[in-house]
Amino acid sequence: MGMTDPIADMLTRIRNANRVHFKSVDVVYSGVNVNIAKVLKKTGYIGGYDVKKDEKGHDVLKVYLKYPDSKRTIINDIQRVSKPGRRVYVKGDEIPKVLNGYGVAIISTSKGVITDKEAREKSVGGEVLCKVW
């Protein structure tokens, strides 16, 4: 049986690994997950990512987490906004700010998966996938 929400699974794995200071975490591979990882890397929330094969030959997205020191984390929280049961769409002029601009909303738009700031600059709306701060 397939997974209902691979994005939520990815965010939960990152959140859990981040809380126990893992260096990396393996996530289910999907195109959207790779695009979210690109945005997280670009905004500085993760150290990087790779696409690898597991022992069965399936693609796995390996996300490398980063920490400023041994006690603190860069990602304070990461939350799914739009869910399979309740999709959340916003117009280009109604894009929410996360913690008054300290956090980032990741939005799936017609221009690709981008941050809330980029979506405001391009004046393009879309589905709010998650919030990170």
Swiss-Prot record:
Claim: Hydrolase is one of the keywords in the record: no
Family the entry assigns: Belongs to the universal ribosomal protein uS8 family.
Function text: One of the primary rRNA binding proteins, it binds directly to 16S rRNA central domain where it helps coordinate assembly of the platform of the 30S subunit.
UniProt GO cellular component terms: ribonucleoprotein complex; ribosome
InterPro entries per the UniProt record, alphabetical: Ribosomal_uS8, Ribosomal_uS8_CS, Ribosomal_uS8_sf
Protein's recorded name: Small ribosomal subunit protein uS8
Keywords in alphabetical order: Ribonucleoprotein, Ribosomal protein, RNA-binding, rRNA-binding
Gene3D superfamilies documented for this protein: 3.30.1370.30, 3.30.1490.10
Superkingdom to which the source organism belongs: Bacteria
Subunit structure of this chain's protein: Part of the 30S ribosomal subunit. Contacts proteins S5 and S12.
Gene: rpsH
The organism's taxonomic lineage, starting at the top: Bacteria, Pseudomonadati, Thermodesulfobacteriota, Syntrophia, Syntrophales
